[in-house]
Amino acid sequence: MESSLYDEFGNYVGPEIESDRDSDDEVEDEDLQDKHLEENGSDGEQGPGGSNGWITTINDVEMENQIVLPEDKKYYPTAEEVYGEDVETLVMDEDEQPLEQPIIKPVRDIRFEVGVKDQATYVSTQFLIGLMSNPALVRNVALVGHLQHGKTVFMDMLVEQTHHMSTFNAKNEKHMKYTDTRVDEQERNISIKAVPMSLVLEDSRSKSYLCNIMDTPGHVNFSDEMTASLRLADGAVLIVDAAEGVMVNTERAIRHAIQDHLPIVVVINKVDRLITELKLPPRDAYYKLRHTIEVINNHISAASTTAGDLPLIDPAAGNVCFASGTAGWSFTLQSFAKMYAKLHGVAMDVDKFASRLWGDVYYHSDTRVFKRSPPVGGGERAFVQFILEPLYKIYSQVIGEHKKSVETTLAELGVTLSNSAYKLNVRPLLRLACSSVFGSASGFTDMLVKHIPSPREAAARKVDHSYTGTKDSPIYESMVECDPSGPLMVNVTKLYPKSDTSVFDVFGRVYSGRLQTGQSVRVLGEGYSPEDEEDMTIKEVTKLWIYQARYRIPVSSAPPGSWVLIEGVDASIMKTATLCNASYDEDVYIFRALQFNTLPVVKTATEPLNPSELPKMVEGLRKISKSYPLAITKVEESGEHTILGTGELYLDSIMKDLRELYSEVEVKVADPVVSFCETVVESSSMKCFAETPNKKNKITMIAEPLDRGLAEDIENGVVSIDWNRKQLGDFFRTKYDWDLLAARSIWAFGPDKQGPNILLDDTLPTEVDRNLMMAVKDSIVQGFQWGAREGPLCDEPIRNVKFKIVDARIAPEPLHRGSGQMIPTARRVAYSAFLMATPRLMEPVYYVEIQTPIDCVTAIYTVLSRRRGHVTSDVPQPGTPAYIVKAFLPVIESFGFETDLRYHTQGQAFCLSVFDHWAIVPGDPLDKAIQLRPLEPAPIQHLAREFMVKTRRRKGMSEDVSGNKFFDEAMMVELAQQTGDLHLQMI
């Protein structure tokens, strides 16, 4: 490098080179071009008469050699060139999406259901939809009963008779369980969700009826699904295992159906267990069946005392069906009589013949008449002779005899099977033979048609029971008439998740009007009333289906009396809802919330493993609350999220859904605990008073225990606060021996209209101004109900307490007696009266039913005694070698009980537990002398203190109840003077 060409800093200072000259020429050319444009006008257009020769030269010659940078090259046509000038195109940057939202969302299809696109049926979809429009040809029923009594398999039999499919796998001899649509239901071998199907069934005259049937779970933990199903049904089909008889959930289903004013028909299922398992002779099988029916009737009679007289079940009346879902057959006495008439070709009065096939009726073959007395030399009852003996013959010969004898027996019954059929295994052959002999379930359909009312016939009773509005409204009249042209009213009780679990479809029953796709409806929640319309949204119905368990039939409208699955309205629905026309101007009232026959007393706290995923878990908990009718999810003051359920299996199912379906996050679960209640066992030791903050008002109150059984009557709806004073007075005076003045001075139940606490105005008109008391009544009631909802011991509900207002000083000026003054004061005085009445904790207690062999009974006693449980009865199960042990067990002691029980009985005992009642926990929760030692079991008398302290800790409260919080200063002075009071230690 020559040093003369560069300066000391390395900059070139030599002669001009060629490349610099070129760049200078380009700059000059640009300047000339700009100058030329300015001469031709500011907008770049050629001036009049101006020459364009120079520009043409530049474009034609020099632009061909111009270097174009890669980013300036035009590889593709513009959007305007492709789509035209009339189309607006937008280019969006990926940065405009939030970070948590992927640019391309993956298709979210969670496999939690077993489904098919469509299923061929023996009748067309148009025929099924046509039947929906005729309420007289529709029957809405729910299959209810105990666990493993065959409800789902019985449903399989009906599905097989209406669809081009087989629900029985002949290779592995397992049933499809068509209505167990969830994968975990198939794995656990129990039903978890209630699932509907609409089947077209023929009666014995080949007339078709649309039977909307809801298959419900039999496990007592999932009885909330049964409650939701019975609300939509016009009748209950009670499925009972012939061998096991009436069990705990059978009893509860009977009671629940009667409380809902639903007629009951019975299917005695698994009759073949009497033949193949118990090996009972036909006569003993009859005794067993008769005993089962008698027990059912006893329960119906016992439950009918509060709901009015209901017809008892009787096979001769046609409301009992005998069946075996596993073998695929069913019959009633009437259908069996018709089979005899057809087989022998004899003209007879089928109903009279059927009425003689049950009870102590004998057939005298010599005179060919039926009599109450047995023939000379003895004989079997008609049911045994004409029904059980042929049934036993079919079973015994198919299972154990030679092919020839089976052929002969079936030929006598008018059935011929192919040679290939006889090569089948025993179970498939038995199914084929029985289904050929007994035919379709026409007897079952006859029973539904005769004993279950149609939607129109049942409408008045259903609406009276579930609708909260008055009877003199046009809506009520339309619902009673099932008027398709009336105002729309739909009761929603179930929500089913879509395949991606992001939203839900809602399932309900149309009572009046016609629900159509594209229709705008008002969605009224459980908190809606014409006075308070906050819980109301307007949504558009986007799709409607007939829900068929594993597939759906799309429809454009749903007439009154039909069950329908609805898309697009679920956003604001939590449990149940009422749908009505968005344009309807009259006052609309809602359908009542579901009244469950059990309580969610088991709770557990949850939190995400990764704290940043808390919003996902909270959203998942919201969906859990939608999916499970009885599940309660709430946030404690400490910030922990708790889930309340009916038992361990219920919570296990919830947690599985939360982790895998609704939140898809890892969730940590705390040890399960139980809900408690707070109560008193004595009257308040002194009159407790509290002054309002402005010192202008003073309320004096005492607390005392309620009469035994009264809390249960209030909760079960036997007595209602909505009754007039005369009705209330008569009820309390006759049943609980209250004086008329006290009975008519009841102000409220708490913490709600069916709460197990009572507030009475026990003031004297001569001492207290009645007008002023009435002016502040609502505020005092609100304070009482607030206090009853969260008691002073550990923020648990108060139960079984009667609060009496014995004195009050109310300011005459409305300004000084506002709700802000009265509500907190009423709550505080209720707490102080409660604390002075010897407070106690109450814990929930399970009723436990255990099936066991007799040699395991002793071990069961031992296991129960370790957990503070006690046996109430142990009796043999009639006709079986098993024993039924009935016991009570505190819920807090029940965790792990089933595992413990099976361990000590080598897996031979099986138990089911369901909430039964509340019991007082031993010990005084306010006894500070009790020292709780970590990692040591507390003595029985220390349990109340232990439960209270640990519950308060878990909720983030101080360990002890503070007297300063609930007692006024003047009250504290008065308390200090009563030095003999046992609870001074609390101050």
UniProtKB/Swiss-Prot annotation:
GTP binds at residues 145-152, 215-219, 269-272. GO terms for molecular function: GTP binding; GTPase activity. Residues 395-397 are annotated as: G5. Residues 1-54 are annotated as: Disordered. Residues 189-193 are annotated as: G2. GO terms for biological process: embryo development ending in seed dormancy; floral organ development; mRNA processing; regulation of embryo sac egg cell differentiation; RNA splicing. One of its GO terms (cellular component) is spliceosomal complex. PROSITE patterns: G_TR_2. Expressed in flower buds, open flowers and siliques. Expressed at low levels in rosettes leaves, cauline leaves and stems. Disruption phenotype: Gametophytic lethality due to female gametophyte defect, when homozygous. Residues 145-152 are annotated as: G1. Keywords: GTP-binding, mRNA processing, mRNA splicing, Nucleotide-binding, Nucleus, Spliceosome. NCBIfam families: small_GTP (TIGR00231). Belongs to the TRAFAC class translation factor GTPase superfamily. Classic translation factor GTPase family. This is 110 kDa U5 small nuclear ribonucleoprotein component CLO. It comes from Arabidopsis thaliana (Mouse-ear cress).
